[in-house]
């Protein structure tokens, strides 16, 4: 059991190291429509996002039909970003609560309908810290930058392991609760079946007695 648990945590650690923690998306959005994108974020994690509408006529200003409203909310409904009638923007915040965060894009209503092409990049954790912007040319500063990046990566993996462990404990509690409820339901179903069978037996007995069969 211990070896299996150790192997499980090793696999989770490898996945945490290699799994992507940023999303770069390109999608189309029609006039008057809304598209939402979810991201599972740990509490106290930094997250940044930026978005823009592709310009179909490069070098010219975007028409008024090419505007969107953007809203980023937590699973409990708290608002972290809200922009109206924009063609580009960005957001950054530290997640207060763990869970799914939703970024919803709504295109302005227009007739005839137009299609907007939107680029959206969402980074969480280590990748949200733009270390490349603070890296310098000197060898010492480059080494310091690499060490800080590695420390951030290690801390992120450490936090991810604790987060996964907490999620695993929550799932185990849910499974135990579900099994208990299923056991009670099985017992209740058994007594219901016994009761129905008894009622049928009494009904048949009364019926046959009236018919003088027994």
Swiss-Prot record:
InterPro entries: Emp24-like, GOLD_dom. Residues 164-177 form a coiled coil. The modification Omega-N-methylated arginine is found at residue 167. Pfam families: EMP24_GP25L. Keywords: Coiled coil, Endoplasmic reticulum, ER-Golgi transport, Glycoprotein, Golgi apparatus, Membrane, Methylation, Protein transport, Signal, Transmembrane, Transmembrane helix, Transport. A motif (COPII vesicle coat-binding) lies at residues 207-208. Residues 1-24 form the signal peptide. Residues 34-149 form the GOLD domain. Glycans are attached at residue 175. It comes from the Eukaryota. The chain crosses the membrane at residues 182-202. One of its GO terms (biological process) is protein transport. It is a single-pass type I membrane protein. The keyword Oxidoreductase does not apply. It is found in: Endoplasmic reticulum membrane; Golgi apparatus, cis-Golgi network membrane; Golgi apparatus, Golgi stack membrane. The keyword Coiled coil applies. Probably oligomerizes with other members of the EMP24/GP25L family. Associates with the COPI vesicle coat (coatomer). Associates with the COPII vesicle coat (coatomer). Belongs to the EMP24/GP25L family. The cytoplasmic C-terminal domain contains a functional dilysine-retrieval motif, which is involved in the retrograde Golgi-to-ER transport of the protein. Involved in vesicular protein trafficking. Mainly functions in the early secretory pathway. Thought to act as cargo receptor at the lumenal side for incorporation of secretory cargo molecules into transport vesicles and to be involved in vesicle coat formation at the cytoplasmic side. PANTHER family: TRANSMEMBRANE EMP24 DOMAIN-CONTAINING PROTEIN. This is Transmembrane emp24 domain-containing protein p24delta10. It comes from Arabidopsis thaliana (Mouse-ear cress). The lineage of its organism: Eukaryota, Viridiplantae, Streptophyta, Embryophyta, Tracheophyta.
